[in-house]
Amino acid sequence: MKVIGAGWPRTGTLSTREALTRLGLPCYHMAEVALHEDYTRAWYSFLIERKPMDWKALFSNYSATVDAPAAFFYREIFAAFPDARVVLNLRDPESWYKSYMTLHGAMQDLSPHRHANPRLDMWLQVVEAIHEHSVGANADRDRCIAAFNAHNRRVQEEIPKDRLLVFRVQEGWAPLCEFLGCEVPYEPFPHLNEGADTVKAGLAFIFGIS
C-alpha cells in the first residue's frame, strides 16, 4: 500500500482513483466493495460483527485506496502501512453535503429490494454502518458538515506533513505527481463525476435488480 486516500466520498475520489490507476497504482474504492462479494463480507464482518480487519489481506491486490469505506479508517490503515503516503481530498463543505446526501438517497432507493437479495442487503448494511460511523444515523445538514470538517482537521493534525497531500482535483496532475515522485502523464487529468442516477443504475446492474 503506497497511497491512502483519507478524503470522504464526493470529494473527487473517483477522479483520484482513475488518476492513481493511470499512474500505475491499482486503487481500491467503494465500487470494489459492491463488485466483489468477498470485500462486502470483509467490511460486514468489521463494521457489523465487530471483528478485526486484516488490512494487509484486504488490500493485497492494490497499491492505493480512496473513498469509503477505507477513508473513514485512515488511522488504522496508516498504522498497518506506515510507509504509505496520505492524500486528503477536499471540497467546499456545502457542495459536498448536497452531493453526498443525493448519493446516499440514491443508494437507499435500492432498499425495497434488499429482503429478496441477501447480497444487496449485506452491502446496504455496510453502507448504513459507514454513514452512521461518519455523520450519524439521522444527521442533519449542520451535523454532517461539522463531521466532514472535523474529519479533515483530524487528518491534517494526525498525519505527518511530509506524508500528507491536501488535494483538490481541480489542481490536476502536478501536486499529485510531485507528492508521489512520478512524472506528469501526457494526458488530461481525469475528471469523473457519476451522478446519483448513474450510480443507482450501476448498482442495480451489479446486484441484478431489474
Summary of predicted features, one role per range:
Residues 45-77, 81:
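Conserved nucleotide-sensing/catalytic segment adjacent to the nucleotide-binding pocket
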Residues 21, 25-26, 32, 47-59, 75-166, ...:
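PAPS-dependent sulfotransferase catalytic domain
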Residues 1-60:
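PAPS-dependent sulfotransferase catalytic core
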Residues 32-41, 87-97, 114-115, 150-209:
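The conserved 3'-phosphoadenosine-5'-phosphosulfate
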Residues 5-7, 66-70, 90-91, 169-170:
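Short His-Asn-centered micro-motif
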Residues 13-14, 71-75, 97, 173-176:
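Short, well-ordered alpha-helical microsegments
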Residues 1-4, 61-64, 84-85, 161-165:
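Short active-site oxyanion
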